[in-house]
Amino acid sequence: MDLETFRKLASDRRVIPVTRKLLADGDTPVALYRKLAAERPGTFLLESAENGRSWSRYSFVGVRSAATLTARDGQAHWLGAPPVGVPVDGDPLAALRATIEALHTPHQEGMPPFTGGMVGYLGYDIVRRLEKIGPGERDDLGLPELTMLLTSDLAVMDHWQGSVLLIANAINHNDLDTGVDEAYADAVGRLDAMEADLSRAVAQPPAVLPPSELPEYTALWGGPDFQEAVEDIKERIRAGEAFQVVPSQRFETPCTASALDVYRVLRATNPSPYMYLFRFDGFDVVGSSPEALVKVEDGHAMVHPIAGTRHRGATPQEDQALADELLADPKERAEHLMLVDLGRNDLGRVCEPGSVEVVDFMSVERYSHVMHIVSTVTGKVAAGRTAFDVLTACFPAGTLSGAPKPRAMQIIDELEPSRRGLYGGCVGYLDFAGDSDTAIAIRTALLRKGTAYVQAGAGIVADSDPLAEDQECRNKAAAVLRAVHTANRLGK
């Protein structure tokens, strides 16, 4: 993009991506992250492997953030200078919406699906701003309700072309008509700096990958206590309070490895449709989630409910037998159908009447340790609605709360010993062009002060077996706990 084109675009938009494409057929996304982001706070790495196997076309490296929206004492709080015109306190969700609206910029033809926006997580407990589910006064982690990076610089690796697109977003923070030429020069200077960083050598010696082992861990709320809660939920279901409730338990294990090393192991051992590494101020988030919360692209919304689980078989024959058993299980089918209906209802609140449909129903998707029943529901976003509206209509996922959602969440709030924090919320982005892509925050580790926190849940219905549901939580957490333990021993 030359200066004259930049000047024309600057007349009617506050964000302009200035780009430079380079050949990158010898680099990996992890190597790009090392070179460009250098594991700094305020950076991220997003990747995807469809069905846990083939790698998707794009990987995204967040190199620099202009500011960070978070929450402190229940109020929106900015680290760095926010754009003029957006709230600097009050409801953090309102601040997020206002930021996206203020910086809205049409998508440029020929660009990757994501070129900049607000990237990070919404914790499960932010639903208390959307639904009356209880105060959630017990909060042992004290994690911000949300942390969203206002991404200015990023690199997009195109695996099909063997190229990397460097993007320096010129953001008009002050919403003024002056300083256009200076903004262009600044963006070009940042591109030059990123290109220089790409040319430098970064030591990454081969690391011996030790055998995967389940580490020693502590369950915050497991075993007999969790099983007793399952019986309590079953009584409530029989009394007609809910159809399904999804309680969870948190596991803790020591983590001496870097967040990047945990991510490296997790992407190698448990590739999933949503893989992410975030370095925030004071903590890190690493995950490999199989399940989208909701995706909005070009005015169309998609949810991807996952419910029904079996462990992977030791042989192809056993694996197929377990898949057949899963699809034939009346409890698993009923639970899955309930959550498909919930997804249809969520989209129906923000999509055009008659546009919501189930386009894929009850397929089996396999991952490293478990397999799931999955479906896909789509709809056309109604006029006057935005990706933010779609996200809040679907939040949190029914697969992490239950049905009906409000009552299920109230029961969870009564029974679980602490706020969930990140678990059961979402991770992803709301971009400047009005699209979004978010994953449910499962199969995810919160890394802070030498400890990894991993949480997992189980869907409880009237005939659930408490012991089996307790074990299901442990099975779901195993891949991430193993990855942390393996990363701790890399090269040793």
Question: PLM ranges: what are they?
Answer:
Residues 1-492:
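Extended alpha-helical targeting/anchoring segments
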